[in-house]
Regions:
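Short acidic/polar active-site loop segments enriched in Thr and Asp
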Residues: 111
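Conserved acetyl-CoA-binding loop-helix of GNAT-fold acetyltransferases
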Residues: 89-103, 125-130
C-alpha cells in the first residue's frame, strides 16, 4: 500500500519502514512504534495509524502523518501530522495530508475528519485552512477542526 503525489510517497509505517527511517536518523516516536505493535494484533489497523512521508527525489523521510485509529461509529477519524523542522513551510504537510484525506474519503468508511492544533501553531493552522477544514471551536490551548466529505 502506497499513496503518491507529485513530490511524495506516503507509506504506512511498518517494522521494515521504521528501520529505513531510523537509519536516516528519523525519530519514529512512540505513536509509530505503538501503531506497528497494534497492527501485529489486527492487520486491519494498518492504514488507520501512522504513515511516513517520503520525498520522491531522494527517498528521505520528511515526517509522518496519519490517523488516530479506525473510523468510529459516526464514521469519523482524527488526522495528525509532524514534520522535521527543516521541511516546514514547503507545502509538504498540505500535499501529504490532502492525499491521505482523499484516500480516507474514498474508502467509504469515513464521512468526517477531525483535527486539533495548538492556538499558537500558525504553520499547522495554515495547513488545516488550506485543506478547507472548518474551525469547530477552541479550548484554552487548542483549536478543533473538522472536514466533512
Amino acid at each position: 500500500m502506497k499513496l503518491e503525489t507529485e513530490r511524495l510517497y506516503i507509506v504506512p509505517c511498518t517494522e521494515e519502514s521504521i528501520h529505513v527511517a531510523n537509519e536516516q536518523g528519523y525519530n519514529s516516536g512512540p505513536h509509530i512504534v505503538g501503531h506497528v505493535e497494534n497492527v501485529k494484533q489486527d492487520k486491519d489497523l494498518l492504514p488507520w495509524g501512522a504513515w511516513y512521508v517520503i520525498r520522491k527525489e531522494d527517498d528521505i523521510v520528511l515526517g509522518d502523518i496519519g490517523f488516530k485509529g479506525k473510523p468510529n461509529e459516526e464514521h469519523t477519524v482524527e488526522v495528525g501530522y509532524g514534520f522535521i523542522e527543516k521541511y516546514w513551510n514547503k507545502g509538504y504537510a498540505t500535499e501529504a495530508v490532502s492525499e491521505l484525506i482523499n484516500w480516507a474519503f474514498q474508502t467509504g468508511e469515513v464521512e468526517m475528519i477531525i483535527a486539533e492544533t495548538l492556538l499558537e501553531n500558525e504553520s499547522s493552522i495554515r495547513v488545516l485552512e488550506k485543506l478547507h477544514m472548518k474551525r469547530m471551536g477552541t479550548t484554552e490551548t487548542m483549536i478543533n477542526w473538522k472536514l466533512e466529505k
